[in-house]
């Protein structure tokens, strides 16, 4: 046997993560511009809707173009990196509990947070209306938002960072910082909302550290936004897209009720996100320790 026969074939070198992530973002922006232009053209020429005020159907179409852009960019990069598309963590099989956990956590956050706000007199319910189609349309819109942002920030960016030698919590912090920066041009943004957006990125990314799946983050993200805005009547990250089920009044806009930015701009939200993030990490570390103990005993 010659030396050539026993030399293993080396795999071709792959781009480092620090190069992959900017390249992915660049490709995403290219396709976002392309698909966004097509979507706005369709709204203008076919539906006769202005891009500045597209209405709920228009928002859904524009958000769909962004989701398509991030899926295209992810597919290109994963093929380039010789990684399976399943690596994004979109599989529902075996992760349906994550969908329920995300929903229940969002409900619990608002039961506590909204309940405290009412009890403290920081918000008042002054009106009620139930519009089925508005609530359903808003649910679809925020589903698209959740899937798009989770693929972008957790599925690809955090997923790639976790394949490096970086500490997993540092990787989580980096991806959460990028998530906060994604919202830097939102209306009514200031220091506390930016801190809370960073904490939201930590909260949404924490389950991914232990499952490498997006079911929990997508569900939590979806119901977080949907309950906050269309149901309870807050602004969602400074934005107001549709009519809401509850009409709220804030006697004074301050850091306890979030003011014009919405519940995400409140100190109550800050405390709750820290508590729930710690809870998820505690649960994940405990689960990992149990799995390692079982593996070693076998």
Predicted ranges, named:
Residues 4, 37-61, 81-148, 158-164, ...:
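Juxtamembrane helix-loop-helix connectors linking adjacent transmembrane helices
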Residues 110-113, 168-184, 197-198:
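Small-polar-interrupted transmembrane alpha-helices in polytopic inner-membrane proteins
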């Amino acid at each position: 046997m010659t030396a050539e026969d026993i030399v293993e074939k080396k795999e071709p070198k792959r781009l480092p993560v620090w190069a992959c992530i900017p390249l992915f973002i660049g490709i995403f922006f290219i396709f976002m511009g392309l698909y966004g232009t097509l979507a706005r053209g369709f709204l203008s020429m076919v539906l006769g809707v202005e891009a500045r005020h597209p209405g709920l159907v228009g928002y859904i179409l524009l958000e769909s173009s962004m989701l398509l852009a991030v899926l295209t960019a992810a597919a290109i990069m994963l093929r380039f990196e010789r990684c399976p598309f399943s690596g994004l963590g979109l599989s529902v099989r075996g992760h349906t509990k994550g969908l329920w956990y995300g929903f229940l956590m969002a409900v619990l956050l608002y039961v506590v947070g909204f309940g405290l706000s009412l009890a403290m007199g920081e918000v008042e319910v002054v009106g009620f209306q139930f519009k089925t189609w508005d609530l359903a349309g808003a649910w679809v819109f925020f589903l698209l938002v959740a899937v798009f942002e989770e693929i972008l920030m957790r599925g690809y960016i955090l997923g790639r960072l976790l394949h490096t030698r970086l500490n997993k919590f540092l990787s989580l912090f980096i991806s959460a910082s990028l998530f906060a920066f994604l919202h830097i041009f939102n209306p009514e943004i200031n220091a506390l909302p930016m801190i809370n957006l960073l904490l939201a990125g930590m909260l949404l990314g924490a389950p991914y550290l232990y499952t490498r799946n997006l079911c929990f983050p997508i569900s939590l993200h979806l119901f977080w936004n949907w309950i906050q805005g269309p149901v309870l009547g807050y602004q969602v990250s400074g934005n107001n897209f549709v009519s809401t089920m509850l009409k709220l009044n804030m006697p004074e806009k301050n850091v306890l009720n979030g003011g014009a930015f919405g519940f995400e701009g409140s100190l109550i939200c800050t405390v709750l996100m820290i508590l729930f993030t710690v809870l998820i990490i505690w649960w994940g570390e405990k689960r990992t320790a149990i799995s390692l103990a079982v593996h070693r005993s076998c």
